[in-house]
Amino acid sequence: MTVLPDSENGYLLNYEDQEKRRMNMQHDLIKTYMGKLILAPLPFDQPNLRVLDSGTFNGLWLEDASTLLQSPTLVGTDVSPTAFPAKRPPNTEFHVQSISDPWPTEWRDSFDLVHQKLVIACVPPDEGRQALYRLIDLAKPGTGWVQFTEGSLEHLTPEQRKQYPVLARFQSLVAEMLPHFRWNPRPGKLVRQWLEEYGLQEVQEKVMEIPIGAGNPDPKLGEMAKQNMLEVVSNFRTAATRLPDGTGIRAEDFDPILRDIKVEFETVGGILRFNTVWGRRP
């Protein structure tokens, strides 16, 4: 999730119904391009698996996971309970928990799968690495798996920056802005390295490129990616109003980008990239 401790509800981006719809759409996009929800080779036919979803938001990932597993125990955590669902799958519980804080002692070594998606960007790289290591410690030694999905704001190749110049401008502006919030603009490029440095076994990675708008051969998926990104640009404009003085970045800097990027998406396209990395705890 997108965390900023001094915001009213704990999130940098807005937390209204529109943002909830965007997060659901983003979940569906990533799942489509992953090919399936869980890439870690769990024993799916084994009953009573224990699964954690860190940064669960409204629990949609857990809801999908509940249809794949046999009588699992599902645990969702987030920095804010605002989006926790009133209607929950059986054997599902939700807890308020920041990735920067110690986890409950009794959770250590207890999960068959620890999952997290698009969360680690909300802290600086060194803190992000330690946050992932604390999550790994929650997996069962020898048999427990972790699966992390992250993106980066510097994923365009030099050729793609020429092809999608407005998207490149947006990424450069946000990459300059995020360190002022103590965010990491490139976590997707670091996760595999961190997991291998920890000593995880059977580490694998899947890189997903999602064409935006006119660049997507599937019009429905292209439109979903376009709407998702337009709302992201708008949300970062709002976030820029919270920047301290002297950063050299203004919310108004996003206005021409928001105007031009819509045209670029509808005429040329764009690219989103996400990295999913999974491995087994030794």
Swiss-Prot record:
Protein EC: 2.1.1.-
Keyword terms: Methyltransferase, S-adenosyl-L-methionine, Transferase, Virulence
GO MF terms held by the record: methyltransferase activity
Annotated GO biological process: gliotoxin biosynthetic process; methylation; mycotoxin biosynthetic process; symbiont-mediated suppression of host immune response
Superkingdom of the organism of origin: Eukaryota
UniProt pathway: Mycotoxin biosynthesis
Enzyme class, broadest EC rank: transferase
Protein family: Belongs to the methyltransferase superfamily. LaeA methyltransferase family.
Function: N-methyltransferase; part of the gene cluster that mediates the biosynthesis of gliotoxin, a member of the epipolythiodioxopiperazine (ETP) class of toxins characterized by a disulfide bridged cyclic dipeptide. The first step in gliotoxin biosynthesis is the condensation of serine and phenylalanine to form the cyclo-L-phenylalanyl-L-serine diketopiperazine (DKP) by the NRPS gliP. GliP is also able to produce the DKP cyclo-L-tryptophanyl-L-serine, suggesting that the substrate specificity of the first adenylation (A) domain in gliP is sufficiently relaxed to accommodate both L-Phe and L-Trp.
UniProt name for this protein: N-methyltransferase gliN
Annotated organism of origin: Aspergillus fumigatus (strain ATCC MYA-4609 / CBS 101355 / FGSC A1100 / Af293) (Neosartorya fumigata)
Gene name linked to the record: gliN
